Curated annotation (Swiss-Prot):
Keyword NADP carried by entry: no
Organism listed in the record: Schizosaccharomyces pombe (strain 972 / ATCC 24843) (Fission yeast)
Superkingdom to which the source organism belongs: Eukaryota
InterPro entries registered for this protein in UniProt: MINDY, MINDY_domain
Family the entry assigns: To yeast YGL082w.
Isomerase found in the keyword field: no
UniProt-recorded name of the protein: Uncharacterized protein C12G12.11c
Pfam families: MINDY_DUB (PF04424)
CC annotations in GO: cytosol; nucleus
Basic and acidic residues: compositionally biased ranges: 1-27, 315-339
Keywords: Cytoplasm
């Protein structure tokens, strides 16, 4: 007789609570995925464990960590353990230990505090005329030797005149432009008459409206900014790019000299090698999104279409093979079928004679 365990409601409830607790823990952790990556020096594919992102907020520390993972080499390795999930505290500890091992920071407590805050975002104030210049917020990337760039560079292709560009250059940083925009809104909404100075301010700062109204439409990336990134990020280099309040790990493919950002959306974590990169080019400027690519930088749509065609071909081949087997089985069955026996039963001679004798003995004379 099989052993039957009695159902215990308290135990079941405890198991459910434990399971829910584990799920809750995972929801606060970073999922990992393994991707093949062409190591720039050896030019060979290597397996790298990277971090994925589920919610908004931790993209700065994820981009920084993934950049270190892709930059990892025998002289300065940085690898994540083979775990499906990494907690924020674990990631902070890995980064602090890495910095400690290579003498990247003297004040470890200060570094740990900065890294901890990066799980919730990172404030930056980019310069509108230099892709590598920030007023603040870039220091942590400098500590780990990871270049930080952005593509929000102002130019005449935004409909700005030379006078506009000259005025904006004096503001220099994005936050100063945003403050000027807010001041303009406030003056335009005033009911009382403006002073001559206030009116001059409004007349001279109209260009600010163009910049601020287009910032989300253009996703904080301009053609001038893209051109600068292509010029200054060398082949095989790995950097972090800041765009539209988001941080991404960027790789410059040494074979094509094209730029790609690492896809870290957890929704693609189980796509294997099919979706690993996203192009960073003029399409990104025009639409805000690049084209998804496989690990070998071939557009994912081609890879998926090819796989669909291969699947259809396999299904068709399997169907033809099944039909051929069925036909062979049918022909074999026809050859092995025995001749049909006669339906008329054979008469037993001895029994017939015996019956005749019995009949003769029963005759009545």
């Amino acid at each position: 007789m099989d052993n039957v365990q009695e159902h215990d409601p308290d135990t079941q409830e405890h198991n459910n609570e434990t399971q829910n607790h584990k799920q809750e823990d995972h929801s606060n952790s970073y999922q990992t995925r393994t991707i093949p990556f062409i190591e720039p020096l050896s030019r060979e594919y290597q397996k790298r464990i990277i971090l994925c992102q589920t919610v908004n907020g931790p993209c700065p520390i994820i981009a920084l960590s993934n950049a270190l993972i892709l930059k990892s080499n025998v002289d300065r390795p940085f690898e994540l353990p083979k775990k499906r999930y990494i907690t924020p505290d674990e990631l902070t500890e890995y980064l602090v230990e890495f910095a400690k091992a290579y003498g990247l920071c003297k004040n470890q407590q200060s570094l740990q505090d900065k890294l901890t805050s990066m799980h919730f975002g990172q404030q930056l104030n980019p310069c509108l005329y230099d892709i590598e210049k920030f007023e603040y917020g870039h220091e942590i990337f400098c500590t780990f030797g990871v270049r930080l760039v952005h593509g929000w560079i102002l130019s005449d292709d935004m409909g700005l005149s030379d006078e506009d560009l000259s005025y904006l250059r004096k503001l220099e940083y994005y936050e100063k432009v945003a403050d000027t925009f807010a001041e303009r809104r406030s003056l335009l909404e005033m009911q009382e008459p403006l002073t001559e100075q206030q009116q001059d301010f409004l007349n001279n700062s109209t260009c600010v409206d163009k910049v601020m109204e287009n910032r989300y439409t253009m996703q904080f990336l301009t053609n001038a900014g893209l051109k600068k990134i292509l010029e200054l990020v060398g082949p095989g280099e790995i950097v972090v790019v800041f765009r539209s309040s988001h941080f991404s790990t960027m790789y410059s493919n040494p074979d094509s000299f094209a730029q790609f950002t690492l896809v870290t959306d957890s929704g693609y974590a189980r796509t294997g090698e099919d979706v690993v990169w996203e192009t960073f080019d003029s399409q990104t400027v025009e639409t805000g999104n690049g084209e998804l690519c496989a690990a070998n930088f071939i557009p994912a749509v081609y890879v998926l279409n090819q796989r669909k065609e291969e699947k259809k071909k396999r299904a068709k081949d399997d169907e033809q093979y099944a039909k051929r087997l069925a036909k062979e089985e049918e022909e074999r069955g026809k050859k092995e079928t025995p001749k049909k026996a006669s339906n008329t039963p054979r008469r037993n001679k001895s029994n017939t004679q015996k019956s005749r004798k019995q009949s003769e003995n029963c005759l009545i004379s």
